[in-house]
Amino acid sequence: ALLLWLLDASNNTAMEPYRAFIADKLPPSQTGKGFLAQSFFAGLGITLANVSLYVFQTLLSGMTSAGIPYWVFGSFMLGSVCSIGTVLVSVLRTPEIPPSPEELARLRAKKGDSFGPLREIGLAIIEMPVQLRKLALVYLFQWYAMNCYWQYVSLSVGKNVFGTTDTKSATYESAVSWTGLVNGWYNVITFSVAFSLVALARRRGAKWVHICALLCATVGLVIFPHIGNRFLIFLPIVGLGIAWASIVGVPYIMAVRMVPSSRYGVYMGIINMMIVIPMLLQTLTFGLVYKHLLGNNPTNAMMFAGVLLGLAALAMMWIKEPPIVRDVDEVSDPPNVRTVRVGEVES
């Protein structure tokens, strides 16, 4: 489990610069489209990944002496090639914005300071805007919940749809294969709704879009483990697909409005910590919760994840949403959501 967490943490670390890159490359009025375009491609990629599990199971039969199916090796190898390949394409083909003379002088002054980056991170945490601290609570609930879902959804489908809890049986392998299709389906929903969330966020505010999306997932995950038909389980998982589109895009729309543009990089790294730490916490603690509180029942694990997403929605209500478009670096905590056009002077 710890190695899987390390793999996920490494993947998140590799993806972190892209979020800062979106904020750097796009004008304030287009950052929402940028982050939700990221949601679109994330959903499309995960859909293809989940479908590939189903394909690999039909192409690669047999298993190792340790009981690990060969299709698992094939899936990990394909994932490695795609991860390294796409990062290389982005690094080699996307020009980076050169630093200004002032920024260059500042970087050169810090060159001999080995602890400079750590000091900068520590200072950024100390000076973190209040609303971003509140967003950390939302991240705690939603990423703990998502890790619960990913770890126990196969067990839930195996128990409630295929009628098995024997993880070494052929029936359970069929359940894992079907779970890949279920996960592929919720990611189809993710890339289908991603761009519509942009319009909703501009019209209603990113805060309320994220709250509604999380509540859709709450309802879906509470219902999901109580359905025994393999085709009907695709219906409640639509809610999770909507929430996933929001989780990987909408909070970043708010976050870039909470911090100065000169510190996008360091704060995107801190937001990445807000993802990784809850997942590590879940890895270390949920085993005890699953055994002593949830009775080793994957049905309860799914419902528990749904409740946590509901708590994330409640925590989101505590946040004051920043301006919808901002063209200055100074950050304030406005009492209400408002739209500020670039170049407009507020009275």
Role assignments for model-derived ranges:
Residues 36, 163-188, 300-303:
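Loop-to-transmembrane helix entry
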Residues 2-5, 13-14, 18-19, 25-148, ...:
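Intracellular loop-helix junctions on the cytosolic face of multi-pass helical membrane proteins
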Residues 262-292:
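A late C-terminal transmembrane helix in Major Facilitator Superfamily
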Residues 28-38, 176, 259-271:
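Loop-to-transmembrane helix entry/capping segments in MFS-fold secondary transporters
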Residues 192-206, 290:
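Helix-to-loop junctions at the C-terminal end of transmembrane segments
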Residues 13-26, 246-260:
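Intracellular juxtamembrane helix-capping segments at the cytosolic ends
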Residues 1-14, 232-246:
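Hydrophobic core of transmembrane alpha-helices in multi-pass small-molecule transporters
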Residues 1, 216-228:
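C-terminal ends and interior cores of transmembrane alpha-helices
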